[in-house]
């Protein structure tokens, strides 16, 4: 059995077309959804991510503002910029690209963003809303994973889901989203005693640790759905995920590729969150 691919590029195109349609309707009512992206320093990977986000906005009919600052920018200066963007009615979403320079407290900056504009879903108010099932913005990567499961028509009720990784950005919110859909969820991490014993019981596995080959074919139950959030490089310098793709695809029922799986979905859900922030603001 060879797994069916869950094509993140194709699903992203569908969702972005819907974003563009809804953005056009908002514009007719006098509101153009706006995203501000703030980049501090010259981290090469961050520059690529930021360019992709701005490009995606433009292609979907969203207004975007890119603010670039020198790595020497002070924390107080950055907080002042965030405050100004909070009070700018043309901006509906604020994204401060991480990582920030070491002298800036990233959590303090995230908490300075208005929860109404927290389209990354990292604010403690967003985390609390997710925990309690209240309306709020979901972190984009796990949100994208959920959309992929929805796209293949997968019913999570009563299923056993294993999340490998416990970060605040992916692992923890992923577990909560799966739980909200009535899955039984196990979260594994670096201190998990026997990872294979856990994953072999799983109907759904989400790998999100940032380490190659953390999940191999002998660790996967036949027919399981495997979502690969990892972004690594192999020995030839090519992009790869956390999953041994060639091996696992022969066992799994569905699998996401890297690249072309979760990656494009992350940016797409940022657009969805920004659009929804604008719709809420417009009333």
From Swiss-Prot:
Biological or metabolic pathway of the protein: One-carbon metabolism; tetrahydrofolate interconversion
A Pfam family annotated for this UniProt entry: THF_DHG_CYH
Top-level division of the source organism's lineage: Bacteria
PROSITE patterns, alphabetized: THF_DHG_CYH_1 (PS00766), THF_DHG_CYH_2 (PS00767)
Transmembrane portions of the chain: none
SUPFAM superfamilies linked to this entry: Aminoacid dehydrogenase-like, N-terminal domain, NAD(P)-binding Rossmann-fold domains
EC numbers on record: 1.5.1.5, 3.5.4.9
Reactions accelerated catalytically: (6R)-5,10-methylene-5,6,7,8-tetrahydrofolate + NADP(+) = (6R)-5,10-methenyltetrahydrofolate + NADPH; (6R)-5,10-methenyltetrahydrofolate + H2O = (6R)-10-formyltetrahydrofolate + H(+)
Keywords: Amino-acid biosynthesis, Histidine biosynthesis, Hydrolase, Methionine biosynthesis, Multifunctional enzyme, NADP, One-carbon metabolism, Oxidoreductase, Purine biosynthesis
Binding residues annotated for NADP(+), in chain numbering: 165-167, 190
One GO process term, biological-process aspect: tetrahydrofolate interconversion
A molecular-function term among this protein's GO annotations: methylenetetrahydrofolate dehydrogenase (NADP+) activity
GO-annotated cellular components: cytosol
PANTHER family recorded: C-1-TETRAHYDROFOLATE SYNTHASE, CYTOPLASMIC, C-1-TETRAHYDROFOLATE SYNTHASE, CYTOPLASMIC-RELATED
Assigned protein family: Belongs to the tetrahydrofolate dehydrogenase/cyclohydrolase family.
HAMAP family from the UniProt entry: THF_DHG_CYH
Function: Catalyzes the oxidation of 5,10-methylenetetrahydrofolate to 5,10-methenyltetrahydrofolate and then the hydrolysis of 5,10-methenyltetrahydrofolate to 10-formyltetrahydrofolate.
NCBIfam families per UniProt: PRK10792.1 (NF008058), PRK14186.1 (NF010783), PRK14189.1 (NF010786)
Binding partners and assembly: Homodimer.
Protein name listed in UniProt: Bifunctional protein FolD
